[in-house]
Amino acid sequence: MATLDVNPQRYQEQLAEKVERLNDMFAPYNVPELEVFESPEQHYRMRAEFRVWHEGEDLYYIMFNQETREKYRVDQFPAASRLINDLMPLLVEAMKDNESLRRKLFQVDFLSTLSGEILVSLLYHRQLDEEWIENAKALKQRLNDEGFNLNIIGRARKMKIVLDRDYVIEKLDVNGQSYIYQQVENSFTQPNGKVAEKMLEWAVDCTQESTGDLLELYCGNGNFSLALAQNFDRVLATELAKPSVVSAQYNIAANEIDNVQILRLSAEEFTQAIEGKREFRRLQDAGVDLKSYNCNTIFVDPPRSGMDVDTCKMVQGYERIMYISCNPETLKENLDILCETHNVTRFALFDQFPYTHHMEAGVLLERKA
C-alpha cells in the first residue's frame, strides 16, 4: 500500500476481503464459523508518528509514500483518533514561531486514549537546554488551557525530558466494567482502542466456563490478564520487557485485582522452568511455586514471529489454548503443531488495522477427546 487510504465507503469491502482471505487460509484446520469484529471506519488509531518538515518559516507534518518514498504533507490524519486530529494543527501552530521548540525538531509522536489523555513526544537532532524546558512547559500549559489533558516528552540523543509524565492512563470498557491501564511511551499497546475492547470481551466470553488457574505468556502491560482474572482462581502471567512488567504491576494495583501474579520471564525461560530444566532466582524472589498452580488454560499473544517449536510443545500440555495472533502466517505454522492434539472451537477476526493487509486473529483450541 503506497499511502493509507481511509475511505469509509470502502470499509465493508476491505473487511469482506479479509474475511475471505482468513477463511481460505484456515480452512484446512476445520475451523468453526468466523466471528468478525469491526473497527470504527475512521479515527480508530490511538497513536501516530509524523516526521516534521521545515520550509522557510513554515513547519508541518509529513509522511512518506511507502512505494515511491516521496514525502507528502499531512495536516489531518483520518486514521488517528479525533484527539490526535484536534491537537495536530494547534501543536504545530504553537511551535512554528518559537525558535527553541522548532529548531532541529524532526519528529512528533502522539499517544492518545479513549479516556481523553494524550502524550506528545518531540524528537530533536540537538541537545535540549533550560530554554527548551521553559518553552515546553509554557506550550503544555497553553494547550491544557485549551481543554487538552496533555503531557510532553522531549527526546534527543541519550536524552529524555518528561513534562510531567511519560505515560497515559487508558480506560477500556469490558462488558460494562471499566479497566484502568497505564500505557507508557515507546512500549507496546494495542493501537485500536475500540477493537481492543472487543478483543477483551471475546477473550472473557471464551473462558466463561473455565476452572482452575490461567497461565498467560507474553502478557505485556497485563492487558488481557486483568480482564480474564474474573474467570479464574488465579492468573500467572509472564513478560520479558521490564517497562511492561512495571506497568502490569501498576495496573494490577490500580484495578484492585488480587489474583494476578506477573513474572519477568521470556516464554522460552518459562518453558525451561515449568519443565524443571532450569531454576530461576526471579521465581524464588517472587515467592512463586509453579507446582502450586492448577492451570488448565493457557493464553498466548506472541510477537509477529509466533511461538518456537519448544513453546508450542509446552503449550500442547494444556486442556484449552487461547491464541491471539497479529500474524496469521505464523499462527498457521503453530496450528500445524497444536492441531495434532487440539481442535479449534472458536475463530475470530479483529480488524485492528483497517485499509491495510494486516489481520489480527484469535483462536480457542480444546484438547481432542
Curated annotation (Swiss-Prot):
The active site is at 326 (nucleophile), 360 (proton acceptor). Its EC number is 2.1.1.-, 2.1.1.35. The keyword Nucleotide-binding does not apply. SUPFAM superfamilies: S-adenosyl-L-methionine-dependent methyltransferases. It is an enzyme of class 2 (transferase). PROSITE patterns: SAM_MT_RNA_M5U, TRMA_1, TRMA_2. S-adenosyl-L-methionine binds at residues 190, 218, 223, 239, 301. It comes from the Bacteria. Belongs to the class I-like SAM-binding methyltransferase superfamily. RNA M5U methyltransferase family. TrmA subfamily. NCBIfam families: trmA_only (TIGR02143). This is tRNA/tmRNA (uracil-C(5))-methyltransferase.
